[in-house]
Amino acid sequence: MPFFTTDDRVRLYYDVTGSGPPLILIHGLTASSLYFHKQIPEFSSRFSVVAPDLRGHGRSESSDDHLTIARLAEDLRQLMDFLQIDCFSVVGWSMGAHVIFEFIKRYGCGRIDKIAIIDMAPRLLKSEDWSFGLPGVASRRPGDFGHEDNLLVLSSML
């Protein structure tokens, strides 16, 4: 199984399947690259499909710090650098779409050829001005979403 290590020494899982122009598939919160298991065989006939497990998800390690969308975008940049991918198309589902937009905010659009956004909520967490976010989340700083928060969300779905 392929892993790469980020600059803060967290091992992140990724899979590369097929050949052709790079297509990156970014999963949503509490999911993994396995979310795309039915799409990967189809896409891999025309693309080199890169399907990472985001930090704290799937087969990737967590870190001591809380998850932030900014950190996930940095992890994506580091993975693209590691794989020597200069230009790619990207699909972001749910939180994965937020990661893409953060990537663009931080690094621009120069490396991105095409974008597909699937089922993205405008905001993940509840706040005073957004009542449609996830309930009962114990985030300590804006933009944080730690392991404890993940467990709270999952337990609220039972």
Residue ranges, per PLM feature:
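Active-site micro-motifs of SAM-dependent methyltransferase domains
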Residues: 31, 56, 97, 122-123
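Flexible "cap/lid" loop of the alpha/beta hydrolase fold
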Residues: 98-154
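Conserved acidic catalytic loop of the alpha/beta-hydrolase fold
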Residues: 70-88
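Short, hydrophobic alpha-helix immediately C-terminal to the catalytic nucleophile
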Residues: 37, 77, 101-102
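Conserved alpha/beta-hydrolase "nucleophile elbow" surrounding the catalytic nucleophile
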Residues: 27-29, 88, 92-97
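Residue in the alpha/beta-hydrolase core beta-strand immediately N-terminal to the catalytic nucleophile
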Residues: 53, 89, 113-116
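Conserved HGGG/HGGXW glycine-rich cap/lid loop of the alpha/beta-hydrolase fold
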Residues: 6-65
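Glycine-rich phosphate-binding loop signature in dinucleotide/nucleotide-binding domains
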Residues: 18, 82-86, 109
